[in-house]
Amino acid sequence: MDGNTTDRLSQKDNCRKEKIGSLLDEASTIARRVLDSIQTLAGTTACKGVQIARLKEWAQSNNLWIEDARTLGTFSDRGSENEVYLSLESNRVYKLNDFRYSDDNLMPFFERIRIHNRLFEDCPYVMIGMAENQSGKPCVVLTQPYILAEREATEEEITEELLRLGFHPEMEGEYFSNGYFDIFDASPNNVLMGIDGHLYFIDTIIYKSDTGGLDTYRSLSPNYSPKLH
């Protein structure tokens, strides 16, 4: 067996070994406590800003605050929610996520990461801390394995794979649903065809079904933002 074949066979296995860390659970618990407290005192779920401030305090107090994101790797890209850094030394991708796709509180964000790791266990997210992005916004720092890819997946390949997983296109393919979870942004730039022939869903938006995910996505995605004149 040559080296290339070994790489192809081992990439998927190595990705599966990545497990979500306890930091995500800790951060989720802190955010949940803030939400419960605000709901009790004010009868509202609108507490996103308070949750982010509390998480920043927690990260700074526990040596989890990364002062300079450039220490993670080389700046690679800026998407709608993630600022991406690449470390070729560690074969990792680091994403500073600014919580854009959480509406009035952060709990859907933590649920989404857990769901992603359940559905797409070959390229899971692991939380390693928090940092400010280039816009000065506090972000959670997530890492994923660097995927050796031949190319972006095609829309047809993405649809075929999601159908295989039990998801069906809704609203003329605007998103995919299995009745439990709704997947948005499963577009070619967010799904890679690995050198092992496997599709890797590296960056999708997921909401629980029947929780208003479509309206939330449309209200927060730059794809639907009013154009400035």
Please name every model-derived segment.
Residues T45-K48, A69-D122:
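ATP-binding glycine-rich loop module of kinase domains
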Residues F176-H229:
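Catalytic activation segment of kinase domains across protein kinase-like and atypical kinase folds
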Residues V93-R100, P145-I147, D203-I205:
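Active-site ExK catalytic segment of metal-dependent nucleases
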Residues L86-S87, Y146, M193:
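Conserved hydrophobic "DFG−1" position in protein kinase catalytic cores
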Residues Y101-E111, E152-E157, D210-G213:
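Active-site-adjacent loop/helix micro-motif of nuclease/hydrolase catalytic cores
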